[in-house]
Regions:
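Beta-strand-centric surfaces of beta-sandwich/beta-rich domains
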Residues: 1-194
Length: 194
């Protein structure tokens, strides 16, 4: 699986001398290549409950996803993102990989028949830092304030050797200044490879 970290280990049963090992390099190779078309697609969004985005220049998470702790080897590829402005506000949207969340934490729940756990923003959580792997702008005057985007990124969800799982977060930042009382909704579609 491409998601898990490489690991070296040396052990001693207690009867031999102390030993050491020097790690020089490692590689992961897929024989036969990848079949990008094989997999099961899944979808989730925040339904009929928009996320309040009250302050311009503040980044609000709309949706978050991570691997279930029992499915760390599953290859998950985001396919499509859709964002809708429920107000007459413009946004910059961002797709974050392992962002820093302020104001609390996500409440993840299992997505049915999937390797993913999902969470939705609540208007109190914000993002202060993190790796942005995709983004764009949504103009409320165009297409009813909606935006869609096909995701094309090789960054996959995985975990650290201690089991800490990566989190992918779709977020928006209202443009302008001061209090804007904006709200937005989003959906995400992804594929789990077989």
């Amino acid at each position: 699986t491409p998601n898990l970290p490489l690991r070296y280990e040396i052990s001693n049963d207690g009867t031999g001398p102390a030993s050491s090992m020097q790690h020089i390099c490692a590689t992961v190779i897929s024989e036969g290549g990848e079949t990008n078309g094989t997999g099961i697609t899944h979808f989730f969004g925040n339904g009929n409950t928009p996320v309040s985005c009250a302050t311009a220049g503040t980044v609000y998470p709309l949706l978050a996803m991570r691997l279930k702790s029992t499915h760390l080897g599953t290859e998950v590829r985001p396919l499509d993102l859709h964002i809708l402005s429920r107000t007459s506000d413009d946004y910059e949207w961002r797709l974050y990989f392992n962002p820093t969340i302020s104001g609390g934490s996500f409440s993840f729940s299992a997505h049915t028949n999937s390797a993913i756990e999902e969470a939705v923003g609540d208007g109190t959580l914000t993002i202060t830092a993190g790796q942005i792997i995709d983004g764009g702008l949504i103009n409320s005057a165009q297409k009813g304030g909606a935006g869609s985007h096909n995701v094309d990124n090789a960054q996959l969800l995985g975990s650290a050797i201690d089991g800490t799982r990566d989190v992918l977060v779709l977020a928006v930042m209202p443009l302008g200044s001061g209090t804007v009382n904006a709200s937005a909704q989003a959906t995400i579609t992804w594929k789990e490879s077989l």
